[in-house]
Amino acid sequence: MNLERWTQAAREALAQAQVLAQRMKHQAIDLPHLWAVLLKDERSLAWRLLEKAGADPKALKELQERELARLPKVEGAEVGQYLTSRLSGALNRAEALMEELKDRYVAVDTLVLALAEATPGLPGLEALKGALKELRGGRTVQTEHAESTYNALEQYGIDLTRLAAEGKLDPVIGRDEEIRRVIQILLRRTKNNPVLIGEPGVGKTAIVEGLAQRIVKGDVPEGLKGKRIVSLQMGSLLAGAKYRGEFEERLKAVIQEVVQSQGEVILFIDELHTVVGAGKAEGAVDAGNMLKPALARGELRLIGATTLDEYREIEKDPALERRFQPVYVDEPTVEETISILRGLKEKYEVHHGVRISDSAIIAAATLSHRYITERRLPDKAIDLIDEAAARLRMALESAPEEIDALERKKLQLEIEREALKKEKDPDSQERLKAIEAEIAKLTEEIAKLRAEWEREREILRKLREAQHRLDEVRREIELAERQYDLNRAAELRYGELPKLEAEVEALSEKLRGARFVRLEVTEEDIAEIVSRWTGIPVSKLLEGEREKLLRLEEELHKRVVGQDEAIRAVADAIRRARAGLKDPNRPIGSFLFLGPTGVGKTELAKTLAATLFDTEEAMIRIDMTEYMEKHAVSRLIGAPPGYVGYEEGGQLTEAVRRRPYSVILFDEIEKAHPDVFNILLQILDDGRLTDSHGRTVDFRNTVIILTSNLGSPLILEGLQKGWPYERIRDEVFKVLQQHFRPEFLNRLDEIVVFRPLTKEQIRQIVEIQLSYLRARLAEKRISLELTEAAKDFLAERGYDPVFGARPLRRVIQRELETPLAQKILAGEVKEGDRVQVDVGPAGLVFAVPARVEA
């Protein structure tokens, strides 16, 4: 026995048989050990060979395992070191068979032939030899890795035409133009290799699946009838190719098989760019170069699919590129997407066991097109339908909220009952009786509701079964019509099909008024998924939200005092957006806030973010003092290629990509470099911006606020002279025109001039600032009370028409917070104290009324 003349796989099988014998503590390696190794996997070569020869590999495997269990166990160093004479004879016979078959190496299939001769109850040698020839495709074993080239197409490819015949592919709606163009190229004499090029998610693979379905139906020209489309899996080809030349050998076997089929097989490679450089190593040939000769001669027909960006990989190799004919696949329109979804609807209904309404389909196409901008139709719309249906299915399979709430209440009462059982006083006993009565009532109610829910679920289960049967019957009709079994087709179409359709309709009708089972995916479900993905509120306005929007001014006034014009302008823009009346191609609103420092420009932006999103974190704040130099502008959209930081993207674009629905504040806009305004023009007009990576970022769901101190001296001067608000506004506008270009000012929705704060407004701000301080003190369980005189004192000290409300914060810090902090540290004010503040001759006076001890 010469192991040098065995293939790698055969040597490995023998080594594994030895390991098995050692692990099971058997004296020697015998036939059952080798059989157990060879039949370990259903996809193994031995298993496939025995199946082809008409044997039952599963029964053989079980028989050999029983035989292994019967072998005696031994101890010592000699375990599993020898071959039995039976196995030794079989291995020598394998070498003789190798000569007979004109092979250079003993392969795994040759071993199977030799072992089968030595094992009773298996097919004869001639039957096995016939199966072996079929499996090898008429080739002999000339290399050490020959097994990986057997039946290469079956091993490394997926037959799409077979899947289409079995009804396992989704229907392909539309795309007739592209399919016709692919057929046209495939029918050419040479260079008959179409490559589908398009953005991810537009349906390139679906076009090939559509072609496979047409071939199965016979709806193709004569030259393509009866052909097979096999999808080549590059991953499978590369996986496990450990040795130099093994990958090339596998690919060569695939190419050979396709060439030998004489045009019967059309190869399909998804992600075609992977063939460039696949298997490339030092001195090795990559897949692209191996495919070139067969492609050029027209011996091999290949359909490729790749994205626009990745097609560049193929363009780098002009000799490979010229062998392909590009077919550009555009993104379908919203209307075409709706047709595609209507065609797919049934598949998803059967899979999830729910109904998908037509309004949900229209919503999926329109909302995904409008709000999910980084992905393509129809993929993103299909994903929405799929996820909404999965969500409804999950809700159907878990206990309804009504029952869940009652069960939780019952559990709470049971815990209470157990605690009361230990008490002996009359009150507790009385309470115990009441609880037991309530538990009994709840148990009865839960049982009644559960029975109703179970009844509805049973109807739902029957409905799903009927839908699956209906799907199978439709597939059978299609198959019968293809095979011209018209009697069977008529029997199913006019007998079985109407019966099942009526059953599905009747069961659906029963569930229509169901209490717990909601069977239909609606427009609202789709809107909720979009909101979940993007953070943009697109679902219907709930009553609470309507109230909030109608009272938006009140909400904003809780934190921003005065400035009615600014608050009204912002609130109106938000209401227009949520009512669906805003221009879909522009931001929700763009405002320029002007006015002296400290009057609430930045505070209004923060308040808006907190009101809309319940957190100030939803505000993207860009401080324009950081963008005073020309080179700093690139930080907004990202550094250009080749510069440090290119990979990180822009500070503005990345923030908006992560949170498309937000308030963007450009603070102190007049301090920015003029080039920043060129970037803003695009955002304000088109609601979009392209970053340094070429990605389009959507600003259509943002509120853009720019603040500036320009014209502040004019505003103060005007107020001192008693000018009306309109005149002040006009004067400030003149200053703006000197500083900003007309095309920038013209794109803003509104330019709002903030008024300086009056004494009365400062007094209101004192209350707001004190509420923040009280909230901080509440954490220490200290309450704070100020007399009206103390509040007036703070307002008087903090009033400055030039600096706005900011001096007030400093006064509160100095006059109130600092003395209070000293008293807390000195122990004069402790947890649980009530601090009263009044005005004395020297400033504020603090008093702590005597604590009442509990």
Curated annotation (Swiss-Prot):
It is found in: Cytoplasm. Residues 332-535 are annotated as: Linker. Changing residue 460 to A: Great decrease in chaperone activity. Retains ATPase activity and oligomerization. Changing residue 355 to C: Great decrease in chaperone activity. Retains ATPase activity and oligomerization. GO terms for cellular component: cytoplasm. Residues 545-756 are annotated as: NBD2. Changing residue 270 to N: No effect on ability to bind ATP. Decrease in ATPase activity. Part of a stress-induced multi-chaperone system, it is involved in the recovery of the cell from heat-induced damage, in cooperation with DnaK, DnaJ and GrpE. Acts before DnaK, in the processing of protein aggregates. Protein binding stimulates the ATPase activity; ATP hydrolysis unfolds the denatured protein aggregates, which probably helps expose new hydrophobic binding sites on the surface of ClpB-bound aggregates, contributing to the solubilization and refolding of denatured protein aggregates by DnaK. The Clp repeat (R) domain probably functions as a substrate-discriminating domain, recruiting aggregated proteins to the ClpB hexamer and/or stabilizing bound proteins. The NBD2 domain is responsible for oligomerization, whereas the NBD1 domain stabilizes the hexamer probably in an ATP-dependent manner. The movement of the coiled-coil domain is essential for ClpB ability to rescue proteins from an aggregated state, probably by pulling apart large aggregated proteins, which are bound between the coiled-coils motifs of adjacent ClpB subunits in the functional hexamer. This is Chaperone protein ClpB. It comes from Thermus thermophilus (strain ATCC 27634 / DSM 579 / HB8).
